[in-house]
From Swiss-Prot:
It is found in: Cytoplasm. It comes from Rickettsia bellii (strain RML369-C). Keywords: Cytoplasm, DNA replication, DNA-binding, DNA-directed DNA polymerase, Nucleotidyltransferase, Transferase. The gene is dnaN. Forms a ring-shaped head-to-tail homodimer around DNA which binds and tethers DNA polymerases and other proteins to the DNA. The DNA replisome complex has a single clamp-loading complex (3 tau and 1 each of delta, delta', psi and chi subunits) which binds 3 Pol III cores (1 core on the leading strand and 2 on the lagging strand) each with a beta sliding clamp dimer. Additional proteins in the replisome are other copies of gamma, psi and chi, Ssb, DNA helicase and RNA primase. It holds the Pfam family DNA_pol3_beta. The keyword Cytoplasm applies. GO terms for cellular component: cytoplasm; DNA polymerase III complex. One of its GO terms (biological process) is DNA strand elongation involved in DNA replication. This is Beta sliding clamp.
Amino acid sequence: MLKVIVETKTLVQALGFASSVVEKRNIISELANIKLLAKDGLLELSSTNMDLYLSQKIGVQVVSEGELTVSTKTLNDIVKKLPDSELTLTDLGTTGLEITGKNCRFNLFTLPVESFPVMDNINPEASFKISCAEFAKIIESTKFSVSLDETRYNLNGIYLHVKDSEFYAASTDGHRLSVSSVVLAEKIEDFGVILPQKSAEEILKIVKDSKNANADIEILLSSNKIKFICNENVIMLSKLIDGTFPDYSSFIPENSSSKLVINRKIFADTIERIAIITVEKFRAVKLSLSGEALEISAIGEARGNAKEVINSSKETENFYEYSGETNLDIGFNPQYLEDVLKAIKSDLVELYFSSVSAPVLIKFPESPKDIFVVMPVKV
């Protein structure tokens, strides 16, 4: 029966990833559990919510091989509260899983392994590799504009697609659009799938982990599932959203009459300050643009009003340059602008306007593979 010796910090990290996958409220007890399998010097931890399946292998000292399932939450809550030391996990059969560490012992109830779901096989129609860093970047650049409206289920995820050997991620909630891409090293056939938001968030945590910083992630696709393999020891299988993502290329403005170039950080910080005065019912800030200065203002019902001016400057740390329509006044939901400005760490940001009611194109000179579109609001 299972008996392993493992470093607490190693187990804590793996349980953290596993806990994120497991639903907080499970009426099916098996889905609230994590499966532990000790074999060949590794401890495999498997967790699932039936839409998403995560398998992780960590290095341990295997005293004896075996497998069991135990409450994910209980095991995680215990282990993360223990000091950094070695732990011994021992399957005691009918009396459960024993956890022993420095001056402590816990005994947890277990369930039969036979009742735990098995990860489905996938017959990939396409597969390719990309660096974890590049994959993390395109997901982070698009995850914030996924629609939360469940009636628009085809927008409840990130559209991953390949066109002419360039890998794209795109998302929209109908008010804004985010697109990010990276050129693939290998040539593959065009495809398109919609990755659920939950799955995108979970795989992002894994690829951003420091031990995967210089690793590649392999992506395998079928018509209804996607499989991620990271560093060989982490496998995530996810169902895909069964729907058609809109042709977003028609949403991207091609012509503009005015252009704003401004220091990204100053612009973001100013919007964040002015937005404090706004209220949830109607969140809007007004940009008043001219060649001399940018005025950002807002009026908040029952709160007051706010205004801040950014003057024209050619210095990088407070750069501001505007050309086009004289004295343009346009309104935005401040959160939409803040999300874009936080997604890309660039010195400058460019905004392209065609009218006060038309979508605005946002680009970053230092990150040309990222494109954002935001709809204005009336102010």
